[in-house]
Design a protein with these regions (language model features):
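Short, surface-exposed secondary-structure edge patches
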Residues: 61-68, 347, 663-668, 692
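Short beta-strand-centered aromatic/proline hotspots
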Residues: 86-94, 680-690
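Polar, S/T/G-rich
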Residues: 1-273, 279, 378-399, 406-423, ...
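Short coil-to-beta transition motif at edge beta-strands of beta-rich domains
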Residues: 67-78, 664-677
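Short, structured beta-strand/loop micro-motifs enriched in basic residues and often containing a Trp
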Residues: 55-57, 652-661
Length: 737
């Protein structure tokens, strides 16, 4: 057997008995955060002249190292009979000498290009989503409902989520009853896949995945969650300001007249207009509601010096009617007519439906006409400007959503990615030839049991085997939890059941096992709430102070917005199950932009909960006879149940044995392919200390593939049945108040 080692492209001299042992493990795929890659034990390389040249004579402690840098990663690969069995990096650990011979101690490590380590402390806010910037208007909102990531791909979506806006009905009103919405009630969400693609590509990786490119996954979104309500960015606030100068040279205002001042010059600097000033009509309309300081400065002079008082007044006129005086000055009789620079400031509350203008009047206290006619002249250095007083105003429809500054939550990219791994039990395997190309699938889709490797003839029977029942070696309890989200309904559920909404606890039947394993997800779950008998079911993110009673006896809830945590939802534009209306900007719709934990709250197929919630805060629409349903096709049953059974079932077992692997067998190692030995399929867990320079058989660890009955989802009606069970989960209690 010929073994060759190349470091930095140079072949090294090896001793005949060199020991190069390599280990491969599924742990790198199951737990990508702790990925180590293929590793070897320390190997000893003889100190031949040729090897001295490769390592730059580093053994000469009295000389500088020439060429070789031990602090830099260098490529290394191992060939066995011309077949590559290892490709990674080499690290020089030490040079030893017994006085006669010297040896180089070298560690070989698989190219551990770890996506999670590469991401480091980078946050979602470090990613650039500016290509998703768009105007906050009704057409973009409606367009997202049918033209979002679920179809051609805007990558943003406007779901109907109750953040505490007044437009959302929270009454027990009879159907049909219309919720009436405007643009201001909808905030954008970004697709989970958009986040994922940005994270992976931003780190310099690519991926292949049937699951992550499936239509179902594309329907997942992260809703708006930066604050309880959207505020303007500093840039947007600055865009509302202006500094305007007098236009047209000078302006004369005759005695006894009230005129609009020609403030219309917005260039060159220092003049500017943030976008709200109409230079044609010489008026300003604010792009958001706020308190502003309006400041006016004029340089004025009467054309005559008279023996009468001459008075000039400057006003801010609001909405064409209300005049508020801001400046007044009088040239007293006989006091001359020198030019005066006058200024004033006015604090005024303005909304987006208001506009303001600058007006001026001039009067001479003569009692009789004067010839030539007196007037006051405004000179070119007159100015007019506006500043916001304080605070951060709410965003208003018509503004541009700056997705980088107003939408993206402050969460580590590595955490976001790991939340997805835990939700869907994702296995991440790098390509053997390109470690920055990743294959990502849930456990349920990762293995191809029809495409296995037959190692029956490689089994070294004479070395025996070991079978270990898995049950007692693994935790007895498995817990799957969403993060507590903090709204009224989340806190209510947490108080009643001491667990987050949609969590799941699985307890194995093995009496010898103990311990607990938790798979905690940093997303908050979405509690769906409907107020019976209305068919409208929304995710509702708010806190509640108390209850009150509205006129007519309808129950009204006093709500207050909360800052929502990072959440994940499924979105779909779905029809109502019974007669009702969804009114947006004056148009009636019979479907609505749903988002929640179910793919359809009336007749679901999938659930983003890990388990069936113990309580649901809505029920079937008995008035119309529409019977709603729920499903146990949740995250645990879809993605985790079979995996957990592999380690907890009475037939679960690990097998340790020896196989005679060749270089070609190692080259063809693929953890996605099960191993077939004597009529039994196994998942490959590890190949331990494969010696590239030995004919000895190699220890491998296998996990038996169980013949488990496929999970059959159940869809059940939401009508009574308290105390009944769906498989091993209790049916939910239906809460109507």
């Amino acid at each position: 057997m010929i073994t060759e080692l190349y470091i930095d492209g140079q072949r090294l001299d090896l001793s005949d008995d060199i020991d190069i042992r390599l280990t491969y493990s599924i742990t790198d795929i199951e737990n990508p955060v702790e990925r180590k890659g293929t590793v070897s034990r320390t190997i000893e390389i003889p100190g031949t002249p040729s090897n001295d040249n490769v390592f730059g004579s580093i053994y000469r402690f009295d000389q500088w190292v020439i060429g070789f840098d031990p602090s830099v990663r260098v490529n290394a690969y191992v060939l066995q009979n011309g077949v590559e069995v290892f490709n990674g990096i080499a690290q020089l650990l030490a040079v030893k000498s017994d006085g006669q011979f010297k040896t180089y101690e070298v560690g070989l490590y698989g190219e551990n290009v770890n996506l999670f380590k590469q991401l480091g402390d980078s946050e979602l806010t470090d990613l650039d989503f500016s290509e998703l910037n768009h105007e906050w208007d009704g057409s973009n909102i409606v367009d997202s409902w049918t033209n979002s990531v679920g179809s051609t791909g805007n990558d943003y979506y406007y779901p109907a989520i109750d953040y505490g806006q007044s437009s959302f009905t929270r009454t027990q009103a009879p159907a049909p009853y219309a919720d009436v919405f405007t643009t201001a009630d909808f905030y954008p969400a970004i697709s989970v896949k958009k986040y994922l693609d940005k994270i992976v590509s931003g780190a310099g990786f690519t991926y292949e995945s049937d699951f992550l490119t499936s239509q179902w996954f594309k329907q997942l979104i992260v809703p708006y969650g930066v604050s309880g309500v959207p505020y303007l960015t500093q840039e947007q606030m600055e865009g509302a300001l202006f500094y305007i100068g007098l236009s047209g040279g000078v302006q004369d205002i005759a005695d006894g007249t009230l005129q609009k001042v020609n403030m219309a010059t917005d260039t060159p600097s220092p003049f500017f207009d943030g976008g709200g000033y109409d230079t044609t009509n010489k008026r300003y309309t604010p792009p958001y509601n706020a308190d502003f300081n309006i400041q006016v400065r004029v340089n004025v002079q009467p054309n005559l010096s008279l023996g009468f008082d001459q008075t000039v007044k400057v006003y801010v006129r609001k909405n064409g009617t209300t005049l508020t005086q801001i400046i007044e000055y009088t040239w007293v009789a006989g006091g001359g007519s020198t030019a005066q620079q006058l200024s004033g400031i006015l604090q005024m509350s303005l909304t987006t439906s208001d506009y303001v203008e600058v007006w001026m009047d001039f009067s001479v206290d003569s009692g009789t006409p004067i010839s030539p006619a007196p007037y006051v002249r405004i000179f070119t250095d007159g100015t007019y400007w506006l500043n916001q007083i304080s605070g951060t105003p709410l965003m208003q429809p018509g503004f541009i959503w700056n997705m980088n500054q107003t939408i993206i939550p402050k969460v580590k990219q590595s955490d976001f990615l790991m939340y997805l791994v835990r939700m869907f039990n994702l296995f991440i395997m790098p390509d053997k030839y390109d470690p920055k190309k990743l294959y990502i699938e849930p456990f349920s889709d990762f293995y191809d049991t029809s495409n296995y490797l037959d190692w029956t003839g490689l089994w070294d029977v004479e070395k025996g085997f070991e079978v270990v029942p898995c049950g007692y070696m693994n935790p007895k309890t498995y817990k799957f939890n969403y993060k507590d989200a903090g709204g009224y309904f989340e806190k209510r559920y947490q108080s009643a059941y001491q667990s987050s909404y949609g969590s799941r606890t699985y307890i194995s039947s093995n009496e010898f096992s103990n311990g607990e394993q938790s798979e905690d997800v940093g997303f908050g779950n979405s509690v769906m709430v409907g107020f019976s008998p209305s068919p409208r079911i929304y995710a509702r993110y708010y806190d509640m102070d108390n209850k009150g009673t509205a006129s007519g006896g309808d129950v009204e809830l006093n709500v207050k917005p909360v800052t929502p945590n990072l959440r994940i939802l499924y979105h779909e534009y779905i029809p109502f199950p019974s007669e009702t209306e969804f009114v947006f900007e004056g148009t009636e719709y019979t479907s609505y932009p749903y988002a929640g934990n179910l793919d359809n709250p009336y007749n679901p197929t999938y659930d983003l909960c890990f388990g069936i919630p113990r309580e649901l805060y809505y029920q079937s629409d008995e008035t119309s006879g529409a019977i709603y349903r729920y499903t146990n096709n949740n995250l645990f049953n879809r993605f985790w149940l079979d995996y957990v059974k592999l380690y907890t079932d009475k037939d679960a077992k690990k097998v340790k044995l020896f196989v005679q692997l060749s270089a070609v067998d190692v080259l063809n190692l693929d953890f996605r392919k099960p191993i077939y030995i004597n009529g039994t399929l196994f998942y490959l867990l590890s190949v331990n200390d494969y010696d590239a320079n030995s004919d000895e058989s190699t220890s491998v660890e296998l996990l038996k593939v169980l013949d488990l009955a496929p999970f059959e989802p159940t869809v059940f009606q939401l009508t009574g049945g308290i105390g009944a069970f769906i498989s091993d989960e209790p049916k939910p209690q239906l809460i109507t108040e």
